[in-house]
């Protein structure tokens, strides 16, 4: 008799996606992050659901409701810090996942890649709105500054900002709608993840060499299920250590001060995972120019397949491109550092130089290096 997992209409889909799925035999640990992101999303939806049961999205009570969760709800402090630090873990995995895609040429699967970019934007929007909900000082002023950027759009900008705010400033209407969207968007993310996997399973996974691996495939279970569980244990160890030993390490102390529209914090900044984009935004003196640079810093990923001029897909055998890739990583870390610093000399010029280098490496140096490497192959 045929195994039920291969015949049952529902189990068959799961079987073909996670059990009998043919996978390349040489996938490294860099291929673990997809499953880790799935776990992060599940953790965020579950902890968020329980937090939403106790949270109130009203400017008068939002801050106190978060305090109530931490002090009075059974394990409320654990839920709150798992959710806050789970977001950080989500973005760490997300950036490593994108980095893996850039390094090994996974962006050549353009449908999967484009859905991934859409996922990135959706997750960023969700995280931004979630940061507003505790209604601390940084929540309020972060929401004010970031939504205000839309006023740079010619003609409709000011009306658009007031439409999003639901008034003439960030207030009760803004908080209520942000809570509604913050609750809704993770389910959209989950739906997009399904589409992401659908397109991935149309082509099959890439592998570190970038060479087609059709002739040497192994079943996903047990080989990669075990490998994913190991990665999961490492990630959960890191997350639980962060939550239990240093839960406020990645947060901003200003967010423990209730939101006050009459008192501006000395340094308004977003969460650490947005600092690189924030640094690029600030490095351009013009408001509209800064907003465009901010959007393009992420949208540039969409043209990566067009900028791929190398005859080899992966960077595994391309040492010059590898050097540029790691330089890009260093620049992104520099931008993250600059985004958290005040707007003064020498941080301004460092941020501007790093921003120029970020775009130059992706748009100019990487394609030129690929052409040079193609030429060297002929020797």
Curated annotation (Swiss-Prot):
<dbReference type="InterPro" id="IPR005797">
    <property type="entry name" value="Cyt_b/b6_N"/>
</dbReference>
<dbReference type="InterPro" id="IPR048259">
    <property type="entry name" value="Cytochrome_b_N_euk/bac"/>
</dbReference>
<feature type="transmembrane region" description="Helical">
    <location>
        <begin position="320"/>
        <end position="340"/>
    </location>
</feature>
<keyword id="KW-0812">Transmembrane</keyword>
<keyword id="KW-0679">Respiratory chain</keyword>
<dbReference type="GO" id="GO:0005743">
    <property type="term" value="C:mitochondrial inner membrane"/>
</dbReference>
<dbReference type="InterPro" id="IPR027387">
    <property type="entry name" value="Cytb/b6-like_sf"/>
</dbReference>
<feature type="transmembrane region" description="Helical">
    <location>
        <begin position="77"/>
        <end position="98"/>
    </location>
</feature>
<keyword id="KW-0830">Ubiquinone</keyword>
<dbReference type="GO" id="GO:0045275">
    <property type="term" value="C:respiratory chain complex III"/>
</dbReference>
<feature type="transmembrane region" description="Helical">
    <location>
        <begin position="113"/>
        <end position="133"/>
    </location>
</feature>
<comment type="subunit">
    <text>The cytochrome bc1 complex contains 11 subunits: 3 respiratory subunits (MT-CYB, CYC1 and UQCRFS1), 2 core proteins (UQCRC1 and UQCRC2) and 6 low-molecular weight proteins (UQCRH/QCR6, UQCRB/QCR7, UQCRQ/QCR8, UQCR10/QCR9, UQCR11/QCR10 and a cleavage product of UQCRFS1). This cytochrome bc1 complex then forms a dimer.</text>
</comment>
<comment type="function">
    <text>Component of the ubiquinol-cytochrome c reductase complex (complex III or cytochrome b-c1 complex) that is part of the mitochondrial respiratory chain. The b-c1 complex mediates electron transfer from ubiquinol to cytochrome c. Contributes to the generation of a proton gradient across the mitochondrial membrane that is then used for ATP synthesis.</text>
</comment>
<keyword id="KW-0479">Metal-binding</keyword>
<dbReference type="Pfam" id="PF00032">
    <property type="entry name" value="Cytochrom_B_C"/>
</dbReference>
<dbReference type="InterPro" id="IPR030689">
    <property type="entry name" value="Cytochrome_b"/>
</dbReference>
<feature type="transmembrane region" description="Helical">
    <location>
        <begin position="226"/>
        <end position="246"/>
    </location>
</feature>
<feature type="transmembrane region" description="Helical">
    <location>
        <begin position="288"/>
        <end position="308"/>
    </location>
</feature>
<keyword id="KW-0999">Mitochondrion inner membrane</keyword>
<feature type="binding site" description="axial binding residue">
    <location>
        <position position="196"/>
    </location>
    <ligand>
        <name>heme b b566</name>
    </ligand>
</feature>
<keyword id="KW-1133">Transmembrane helix</keyword>
<keyword id="KW-0349">Heme</keyword>
<dbReference type="GO" id="GO:0046872">
    <property type="term" value="F:metal ion binding"/>
</dbReference>
<keyword id="KW-0249">Electron transport</keyword>
<keyword id="KW-0472">Membrane</keyword>
<dbReference type="InterPro" id="IPR048260">
    <property type="entry name" value="Cytochrome_b_C_euk/bac"/>
</dbReference>
<keyword id="KW-0408">Iron</keyword>
<feature type="binding site" description="axial binding residue">
    <location>
        <position position="83"/>
    </location>
    <ligand>
        <name>heme b b562</name>
    </ligand>
</feature>
<dbReference type="InterPro" id="IPR036150">
    <property type="entry name" value="Cyt_b/b6_C_sf"/>
</dbReference>
<feature type="binding site" description="axial binding residue">
    <location>
        <position position="97"/>
    </location>
    <ligand>
        <name>heme b b566</name>
    </ligand>
</feature>
<keyword id="KW-0496">Mitochondrion</keyword>
<protein>
    <recommendedName>
        <fullName>Cytochrome b</fullName>
    </recommendedName>
</protein>
<dbReference type="GO" id="GO:0006122">
    <property type="term" value="P:mitochondrial electron transport, ubiquinol to cytochrome c"/>
</dbReference>
<feature type="binding site">
    <location>
        <position position="201"/>
    </location>
    <ligand>
        <name>a ubiquinone</name>
    </ligand>
</feature>
<feature type="transmembrane region" description="Helical">
    <location>
        <begin position="178"/>
        <end position="198"/>
    </location>
</feature>
<feature type="transmembrane region" description="Helical">
    <location>
        <begin position="33"/>
        <end position="53"/>
    </location>
</feature>
<keyword id="KW-0813">Transport</keyword>
<feature type="transmembrane region" description="Helical">
    <location>
        <begin position="347"/>
        <end position="367"/>
    </location>
</feature>
<dbReference type="GO" id="GO:0008121">
    <property type="term" value="F:ubiquinol-cytochrome-c reductase activity"/>
</dbReference>
<dbReference type="InterPro" id="IPR005798">
    <property type="entry name" value="Cyt_b/b6_C"/>
</dbReference>
<dbReference type="InterPro" id="IPR016174">
    <property type="entry name" value="Di-haem_cyt_TM"/>
</dbReference>
<feature type="binding site" description="axial binding residue">
    <location>
        <position position="182"/>
    </location>
    <ligand>
        <name>heme b b562</name>
    </ligand>
</feature>
